[in-house]
Amino acid sequence: MRNNDWHGGDYTAAGDAWAHAADDVTATALAALTPPALPAPGRETTADATRDTATARRTTRVLDVGTGSGPAALAAARAGARVVGVDLEPGLLRTARSRARGLAPTDGTVRFVAGDALALPFAADTFDLALSTFGVMFAPEPAKVCAELVRVTRPGGLIAVASWTPSGIMGRIAPTVRRHLGPEPDGTPSPTDWGDPARISSWFAGLPVTFETRVERVRVRYPSLSHAVAAFENKPGPLRRHRAALEAARRWQHARADLAALFALHNRADDDALAFDAPYLLLLARVGTPSRTPTAPLTGLPDAADLPAVRAPRGSRAH
């Protein structure tokens, strides 16, 4: 997709409503990568095991691709990891850096850099965990994105990607608006393609990974229906491009009414608020073969401050 879809607007007004999903995805991925330690023989309490797990996390290198305003990157840092968040949009990176100032001294480290999911500015095997929450789904050439995620993740490391499902409410928002512009050309990629396990399997074909997928849900809540509609119609991304085209054709108000009707149909709030459960597909992919899997967390990786802040060519996005 075109990077200018993400210029301006207010992403956080909409995106913050589901940002807590990043906490769940990050916790799940870190637990799969570094399972909680059990008390070793001769150690009497689980406190020692908890400290062992925390120590292991201190050496865990995490890459958040399409970091946006940084919810997943910050969640990983709060868990003690050493994190790099990558995005193409300067405004979102500024928001992420501002929010990183709220990390505690006892948390891990995080750095946010400009970069493209199609050409990540890191050496091979750099990270223990590469994750993306509703980020890489917006990048073009998904097979190339998968290859890049595998390339920068060490053998035995993990890839975790969360993406909206096509049939869920979040996957239906863009089509609900887009249909007022007429049918899209055959073969036009959709961000919700990442919510289809069969497509994911085809993208990873030939790459050294084993993976599983499962559907999870996140409760999305806004103060009211009107707040939700306003948040989405001003949110940067493909929807705003559709809105501009519909306004030019004087059809936006019809599309806006359909968007409001979609939200109302899925509303689960028992007050004046709007709340709905949004399903997403969680992909967990293990890189490399078991024989190559290290038995301990990888150490000796470069510090986040040493990683290059390379601005990739414009024209595609990781978020």
Task: Set out the residue ranges of the language-model regions.
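A short SAM/SAH-binding and catalytic strip from SAM-dependent methyltransferases
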Residues: 128-142
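Conserved class I S-adenosyl-L-methionine
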Residues: 1-42, 46, 50, 54-57, 160-185, ...
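Intrinsically disordered, low-complexity terminal tails and inter-domain linkers enriched
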Residues: 34-60, 104-108, 288-318
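Class I SAM-dependent methyltransferase SAM/SAH-binding core
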Residues: 61-120, 144
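A short glycine-rich, Lys/Arg-flanked "PGG" loop and its adjoining helix->strand segment in the class I
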Residues: 143-158
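A short acidic, Gly/Pro-enriched loop at the edge of an enzyme's catalytic core
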Residues: 118-129
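Conserved Class I S-adenosyl-L-methionine
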Residues: 3-10, 69, 193-294, 298-319
